[in-house]
Each structure stands twice: as C-alpha cells, then as structure tokens.
Amino acid sequence: MSIKHTAVSYYGLNYVEHAVKDFEEMKEHGCDTVILAITEFDMDFWFPSINNIVKSAHNLGLRVIADPWGIGKYFGGEQVSLFLQNNVHHRQVSAYTGEVLNAACFNTNSFRDYFRNICMKLARDTEVD
C-alpha cells in the first residue's frame, strides 16, 4: 500500500495570517493535507476564524480534515473543557476505584449530544473536506 497523502496536525486556529505562513511551509515540505485540531475553546471563541483558515488552506491547495480535539477531555488534549465545567455529574467514573475522573462520560446523552453538535456545526458551517 502506498502513501497517498502527507499531513500535518495543526493547533492554534486564532489568526489566519499565521496559519497561511505555516501552510506555505507545510507545502514546501511536501504536505498536501492539514488536520485542524479543533477544541471546545476554538468552537466557542474562535469559530469565525476556523472557516477562514480552512479557505486559506484550500487556496494553497491543501486538503483540510477537522479533528475535534480534547472535547470533554474524552478525546485527549490538555485544553480546558467547558462541557466538564458545566456538567460535573457527567464525568467518567473509574471501574476500579469509583473515583470521578476528569473526562466526560460518552455514555451520557448530554455528552453525546454536545459532541454531535460540534461535529455537525463543523460539517454544516465550514468547508472542511
């Protein structure tokens, strides 16, 4: 099986002008895809920038994949989770110790809905590939 795409994961969706410079460097190194790691914070505070960054990547010929990163701390990441702050009773519980953990429980409808809404908003309101 041959490698069809070369990608770089990209964090920090705040400023389009910085992203463009980074994307140009990615292209110089042979990358054709950028994976945008999108956090809860990005969705809440930087959402208007996300699609502008997607468009700038497309203008440079890059394929764009959205990666919901650190959402509820369920999907990794050290970012602050607004879901966890607002839903303290919907956290994972250790099967061994009963300790409440600092990660959302995917078995709760509230977290599933929260995560699905983020994914749907990215699919509906951006031009990610």
Identify the residue ranges that each predicted region occupies.
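Hydrophobic faces of well-ordered beta-strands that scaffold small-molecule active sites
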Residues: 4-10, 34-36, 64-68, 129
